């Protein structure tokens, strides 16, 4: 299964040529992760961050084509691996079925000591729903 989100390419996302300035993609991906944690895992970042966190430990991206101001992007979020305190993510960004960007990251659940700590059971259950079938 996957978590799908739609995001418009806004003026603030673009460089003077009218295409997404690539670091903005990473903000969009984080927005999708944050939405998933709030809407599906019932673990909103506003409640996580006073004591815990879900930092990105690794991030890789591949860009297939530019995205333009005014377009609507679909972002598909899934997991290729779920560990005790980490998750390996996969993102596919497209516009009208045409690939624009793919990315993989590793998210780590950390405690107040900023060391990895196991996912809470209800969060792990929600994350399991994102695991890709092998």
Language-model features: where?
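Conserved beta-strand segments that form the floor/walls of ligand-binding pockets within enzyme
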Residues: 20-21, 62, 74, 92, ...
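HotDog/MaoC-like acyl-thioester-processing domains
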Residues: 3, 68-69, 80-134
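Hydrophobic beta-strand-centered segment that forms part of the acyl-chain substrate-binding groove
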Residues: 36-81, 87, 101-102, 108
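Hot-dog-fold acyl-thioester-processing enzymes
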Residues: 1-56, 111-134
């Amino acid at each position: 299964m996957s978590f799908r989100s739609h995001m418009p390419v806004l003026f603030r996302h673009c460089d003077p040529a009218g295409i997404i300035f690539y670091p903005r993609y990473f903000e969009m991906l984080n927005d999708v992760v944050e939405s998933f944690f709030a809407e599906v895992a019932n673990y909103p970042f506003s409640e996580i961050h006073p004591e815990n966190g879900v930092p990105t430990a690794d991030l890789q991206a591949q860009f297939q084509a530019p995205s333009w101001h005014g377009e609507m992007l679909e972002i598909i979020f899934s997991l290729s691996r779920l560990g005790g305190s980490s998750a390996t993510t996969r993102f596919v960004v497209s516009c009208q079925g045409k690939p624009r960007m793919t990315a993989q990251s590793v998210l780590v659940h950390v405690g107040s000591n900023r060391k990895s700590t196991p996912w809470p059971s209800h969060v792990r259950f929600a994350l399991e729903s994102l695991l890709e079938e092998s």
